[in-house]
Amino acid sequence: ILTFVFGLEPTSPPIDVMLMIVAVIAAASCMQAAGGLDLMVKWAEKLLRKNPSKITLLSPLVTYIFTFIAGTGHVAYSVLPVIAEVATETKIRPERPLGIAVIASQQAITASPISAATVALLSMLSGHNISLMDILMISVPCTLIGVLVGAFCSLHVGKELAEDPEYLRRVANEEFTSDKYRAKGVENHHAALLSVIIFIAATIGIVLFGS
């Protein structure tokens, strides 16, 4: 509409941002193919199942770290079934940890050094003597503080399950399945671990070179 109706001249395509997205997707795909993402989900599952009472506080930190490392919020999908199941088993409203976990994964996009959002912002500020480290020094603590505040607020969202009539009705009607969700096993643990290490090392390298 702006081009054909109002006659505005289109700008050049954001090649840098597009190449960054391609690079991140390619690297994340390699890590997934090597089993690295499955290994990370396995670690997250162990952490959450060992600390079920702290699920509302830990789940947003887990999804935040996942997205921060990978540069995309899509990697957090794999851990959401674990969060929902652990919360239900602990008689904690699943919407509490799930809601803030999804928000945390999106907040981490603006703090991740390899996300398209951060790269786009860096390209826009390139002429103002602002480095990647300058952006991260603001975005990381701000998003982390916001996520933690949101997690504490989520502790009091909705009724307790023991007082929720809809939950009690579904329990009485045996609508809940007894099957437990388990994260996908890792066939080659060494290769999976190596892929995670390489990916994290590459992320650190981007931060150092971008500074």
What are these regions (language model features)?
Residues 33-36, 46-50, 86-97, 122-132, ...:
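Juxtamembrane helix-boundary/capping and inter-helix hinge elements in multi-pass membrane proteins
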Residues 2-8, 79-94, 137-143, 189-195:
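Hydrophobic alpha-helical transmembrane segments
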Residues 16-17, 52-56, 135, 139, ...:
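Residue-level signature of transmembrane alpha-helical entry/exit and packing/kink sites
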Residues 2-3, 53-57, 111-112, 172-176:
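Small-residue-rich segments of transmembrane alpha-helices in multi-pass membrane proteins
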Residues 55-59, 98, 195-199:
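Hydrophobic alpha-helical transmembrane segments of polytopic
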Residues 137, 141-211:
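Long, contiguous bundles of hydrophobic transmembrane helices that form the permeation core
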Residues 4-90:
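Membrane-embedded alpha-helical segments and adjacent helix-loop junctions characteristic
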Residues 63-80, 93-138, 143-157:
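Alpha-helical transmembrane segments and, especially, the helix-loop junctions at the ends
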